[in-house]
Amino acid sequence: NEEVLFGGR
């Protein structure tokens, strides 16, 4: 999921 990839935000 995108949440995992962009967890830095």
UniProtKB/Swiss-Prot annotation:
Cleaved by the protease thrombin to yield monomers which, together with fibrinogen alpha (FGA) and fibrinogen gamma (FGG), polymerize to form an insoluble fibrin matrix. Fibrin has a major function in hemostasis as one of the primary components of blood clots. In addition, functions during the early stages of wound repair to stabilize the lesion and guide cell migration during re-epithelialization. Was originally thought to be essential for platelet aggregation, based on in vitro studies using anticoagulated blood. One of its GO terms (biological process) is blood coagulation. This is Fibrinogen beta chain. Conversion of fibrinogen to fibrin is triggered by thrombin, which cleaves fibrinopeptides A and B from alpha and beta chains, and thus exposes the N-terminal polymerization sites responsible for the formation of the soft clot. It comes from Erythrocebus patas (Red guenon). The keyword Disulfide bond applies. The lineage of its organism: Eukaryota, Metazoa, Chordata, Craniata, Vertebrata. A long coiled coil structure formed by 3 polypeptide chains connects the central nodule to the C-terminal domains (distal nodules). The long C-terminal ends of the alpha chains fold back, contributing a fourth strand to the coiled coil structure. The gene is FGB. It is found in: Secreted. Keywords: Adaptive immunity, Blood coagulation, Coiled coil, Disulfide bond, Hemostasis, Immunity, Innate immunity, Secreted.
